[in-house]
Amino acid sequence: MATSPCKTGLVACLLYAQIALAAGPLPIHWRSVNAEALRHLTALLRIDTSNPPGNETEAAQYLADVLQREGIPAKLLSLDPARANLVARIKGNGSARPIAILAHTDVVPAQRSKWSVDPFAAVRRHGHIYGRGALDDKEIVTAGLMVMLLLERRHIPLTRDVIFVAEAGEEGTPGVGINFLIGRHWDEIAAEYALAEGGSAVAQGGKVSYVAITTAEKVPRGVRLIARGPSGHGSRPSPNNAVLRLAAAVAKLGEWRTPMRLNDTTREYFERLASISSPDDADRYLHAGDPARAPEIDRYFERYEPAHYAMVRTTLAPTMLKAGIAFNVIPSEAEASIDIRALPDEDMPRFYAEMRVLIDDPNVEIEPRKPDRPATPPSSTDTAMFRALEHAQRRMFPQAVTLPSMLTGATDMAQLRAKGVQAYGFGPIVEAGDRGEAHANDERLAEASLYKLVEFLWYTILEVQR
């Protein structure tokens, strides 16, 4: 039987310990890490944090309990006792500024009758875990939690503090979440870099072809259309019917082809994407900014690549209609909500003026919504953090390429960028064409994708500490 060197004397024992430390931490046993990550994601998905009303405190307390058991200090900060944010920090040596891992614990509501499973039961099926929040954003919450646990357990020497922020209210109520944290607790979350949701590793046939890291995002700038006309009996139709006026206005906006325009982020995105694309696709991507080719390429995007069509323009989408009190009463007002996702540099007063000219009806009012996120410049690709993300991609997916991209949706990185933080969106592996997407019915995440997400974040955080 082998004998421990510590049994042969104190000097040998100390020498053995020094050799072990010099060799660095033992390799991570990823199978056990994966099992733990799945256990935490399952628990989080079973906590109903639908916003409204939110009730994020239960999820925040779960995270705090896990972290504190490992000796990691964690705080719950809240404007509303039911809607707490969690902030935890592992300190570095202070030679470089902190990193924040940001994720939100609230989720959008789920229409249970449209799901094939209970959206809050964390059902596992065919290698996937189903649940509201599986892709937005409890998988990032889980990855952030696991990285904090690994850093603490393995006693990793850090040059930067690592801050884990599990925030409330991202899905439409930032006043209790990121805005509250920035306004009242900025010293708790201030960082040079932030990592959050928004990106993805896109695979075809199980092989990752590119890792999209969001360095910019479009800006939510919705409006309400209010059409007015005389009320009356449904048996006496009128061409001035408010519903008809509204329908005509919405139809005109639906047919409006707003201009295609590239910025620094989308230009670099298409250049890098061309390097891994077929010759025909590469030709389109490399000439997307060419005025002579733009109309032809734009039509192709509209028909075959709707994500790219949306990425290169300010978009409008009618999302809600409201009119009438009874089927036989012509209403005096009719309303439509239009979701506008603007390019970061869009001149919104001019854009609204163009909408008025297009609608061409003085009886239809355009009422802009109060903005809840600022328009901000893109984060740089020439930073230690972006290089760390590229390093993690090369280590895990050497056949792929990292693409700086512009998110067509919106995240709370906008508020961080407005404070001068270089913020980047990352995300799990998604199979091209998979419809189990965020906010969809039967939202789901491949379990293997969760495991790779944790690993990707781990290697990124280690690399940026160098």
Language-model segments: residues:
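Hydrophobic h-region of N-terminal signal peptides that target proteins for export
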Residues: C13-A23
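Metal-dependent amide/peptide-bond hydrolase catalytic core
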Residues: A23-P25, A74, G199-S209, I213-A216, ...
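A non-catalytic alpha/beta surface segment that caps or lines the substrate-entry region
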Residues: H40, S50-A100, P119-V123
